[in-house]
Amino acid sequence: MPMAPRVLLFCLLGLAVTEGHGLEAAVPIPGCHLHPFNVTVRSDRHGTCQGSHVAQACVGHCESSAFPSRYSVLVASGYRHNITSVSQCCTISSLKKVRVWLHCVGNQRGELEIFTARACQCDMCRLSRY
């Protein structure tokens, strides 16, 4: 192989590898992580007192899978449970209270405690009842 085509081939391979690393950086980090978000708290619908705070939420992706059920599961379910799925959800594993200072009409001040996430984990998915 002459020298010029060989150099061109290495340059193209280098470009392809470099481009691949750029794409990996755009993919979200796997797992379940704390994520900050702004919260505005009001004492009533009229906003007589209000304040803001950066609270923490749990955001991310956890593992899930589905596969054909074992024969024993098929028999036990009367051949109705033919797919077994396993999944976990990103959840708050511990909370903490934080104090939010409220600014009120007439230069008054107040305070209110709210909950924020302290730690996150991938755990069993549960139905929410809010």
Swiss-Prot record:
The signal peptide, as residue positions, is 1-22
Q: Which cystines does this chain contain?
A: C32-C90, C49-C104, C58-C120, C62-C122
GO function terms (MF aspect): hormone activity; protein heterodimerization activity; thyrotropin-releasing hormone receptor binding
Mind listing the UniProt keywords for this protein, alphabetically?
A: Disulfide bond, Glycoprotein, Hormone, Secreted, Signal
Enumerate the InterPro entries for this protein. Cys_knot_C, Cystine-knot_cytokine, Glyco_hormone, Glyco_Hormone_Alpha
**PROSITE patterns documented for this protein:** CTCK_1, CTCK_2, GLYCO_HORMONE_ALPHA_3
Glycosylation-annotated residues: N38, N82
Q: Which domain of life is it from?
A: Eukaryota
The biological process GO terms on file are: adenylate cyclase-activating G protein-coupled receptor signaling pathway; cell surface receptor signaling pathway
Please give the GO cellular component terms listed in this UniProt entry: extracellular region; extracellular space
**Localization per record:** Secreted
Q: Family per UniProt? A: Belongs to the glycoprotein hormones subunit alpha family.
Assembly and binders: Heterodimer with GPHB5; this heterodimer interacts with thyroid-stimulating hormone receptor (TSHR), and hence stimulates cAMP production.
What is the role of this chain?
Functions as a heterodimeric glycoprotein hormone with GPHB5 able to bind and activate the thyroid-stimulating hormone receptor (TSHR), leading to increased cAMP production. Plays a central role in controlling thyroid cell metabolism.
The record's listing under PANTHER family reads: GLYCOPROTEIN HORMONE ALPHA-2
* Descriptive protein name: Glycoprotein hormone alpha-2
Query: Which species is this record about?
Result: Rattus norvegicus
**Originating gene:** Gpha2
